[in-house]
From Swiss-Prot:
Residues 127-149, 162-308 are annotated as: Disordered. Induction: Regulated in parallel with CLCNKA under furosemide treatment. A significant decrease occurred after furosemide treatment in inner medulla (0.5 fold), whereas cortical and outer medulla levels remained unaffected. Regulation with CLCNKA in inner medulla is limited to the thin limb; levels in collecting ducts were not affected by furosemide treatment. During furosemide treatment selective down-regulation with CLCNKA in thin limb plays a role in maintaining salt and water homeostasis. One of its GO terms (molecular function) is chloride channel activity. Interacts with CLCNK channels. Forms heteromers with CLCNKA in the thin ascending limb of Henle and with CLCNKB in the thick ascending limb and more distal segments. It is a multi-pass membrane protein. Palmitoylation is necessary for activation of plasma membrane-inserted CLC-K/barttin channels. Expressed along the distal nephron. The lineage of its organism: Eukaryota, Metazoa, Chordata, Craniata, Vertebrata. This is Barttin. The gene is Bsnd.
Length: 308
């Protein structure tokens, strides 16, 4: 590399010398000589400059990747590496690998025995839930050991919502469950209830005997419960049975209410006698003149105005 660099520099310097020599000869009126020196000098200078410019760029060489790696390893290591790579590439013949893949595919579980059975609402799924063990022997050729497979059968019960017709039939067939007396039914209003008109009306509290009569009637005697059995409509009209029970309860409660009504009449008479006295006291304006008056008229010092 150093020799090439010095040669390029000498080539350029020689071209410059030929140019200067041609200029000197041109001053002595010899055109046939200095033209030759000018042409040779210019060619040498241009060639040297282009050569130097091409050497500045890096050279592109294709070097294999294994060459550097092979230079670092010894020949024994290279031979061992080649044998190991050959073993890894083909550990078994191709037909052996295909046979192993086929055996693995056969060892996978088979899901073809799964069956689906749609059961009705009234059917009992308990017999299907009992697990059963079954053994199956795979067909094998002569001289090969028989492989036995065991699997367990289990049933999966999926509960789906019944249609309205099926639900009504099942409710009519099955007896309605008795509701607990501790939990009270929820109350709900009608959608078309007029709130403004209900506020203007005077509140009419329901008698306590009506609630007692409702509690005495068992829930089972009211017929099969509907889908919204836990809700009680406030504006619902009473049933004929409830009306009969309410009438009986009111007839039984009449003799017990008679002494209470007499007592209320006596209290109203006493209150009416006290009301006139309170009205007379309210009409009086000023301090009352009574023997217990702390400020009598004599001590007040009032004197009548005498008009003279």
């Amino acid at each position: 590399m150093a020799d090439e660099k010095t040669f390029r520099i000498g080539f350029i310097v020689l071209g410059l010398f030929l140019l200067s020599l041609g200029t000197f000869l041109m001053s002595h009126d010899r055109p046939q000589v200095y033209g030759t020196f000018y042409a040779m000098g210019s060619i040498m200078v241009i060639g040297g400059v282009l050569w130097s410019m091409c050497q500045c760029y890096p050279k592109i060489t294709f070097v294999p990747a294994d060459s550097d790696f092979q230079g670092m390893l010894s020949p024994k290591a290279l031979s061992l590496l080649e044998t190991g790579l050959s073993e890894v590439k083909s550990p078994q013949p191709p037909y052996v690998r295909l046979w192993e893949e086929a055996a693995y595919d056969q060892s996978l579980p088979d899901f073809t025995h799964i069956q689906m059975k749609v059961m009705g609402y009234s059917e009992d799924p308990r017999p299907l839930l009992a697990p059963e063990l079954k053994t199956g022997t795979s067909s094998a050729k002569e001289g090969e050991p028989h492989s036995a497979q065991t699997w367990m059968e289990a049933a999966v019960v999926v509960h789906r919502e019944l249609d309205e017709k099926e639900g009504e039939k099942s409710r009519s067939q099955s007896s309605p469950p008795a509701c607990s007396q501790g939990s009270a039914p929820l109350a709900s209003f009608h959608d078309d209830l007029d709130v403004g008109s209900s506020e203007g009306r005077s509140p009419q509290p329901s008698p306590p005997d009506r609630d007692e009569a409702h509690l005495q009637v068992p829930w089972a005697s009211r017929g099969p419960l509907d889908r919204f059995g836990d809700f009680a409509l406030i504006d619902d009209t009473p049933i004929s049975e409830d009306m009969g029970l309410e009438g009986q309860a009111q007839e039984e409660a009449l003799p017990s209410k008679q002494p209470w009504s007499l007592r209320m009449k006596e209290e109203t008479v006493q209150a009416g006698a006290e009301e006139p006295e309170q009205e007379e006291e309210d009409l009086y304006y000023g301090l009352p003149d009574s023997p217990g008056d702390p400020l009598p008229d004599k001590e007040l010092g009032f004197e009548p105005d005498v008009q003279g």
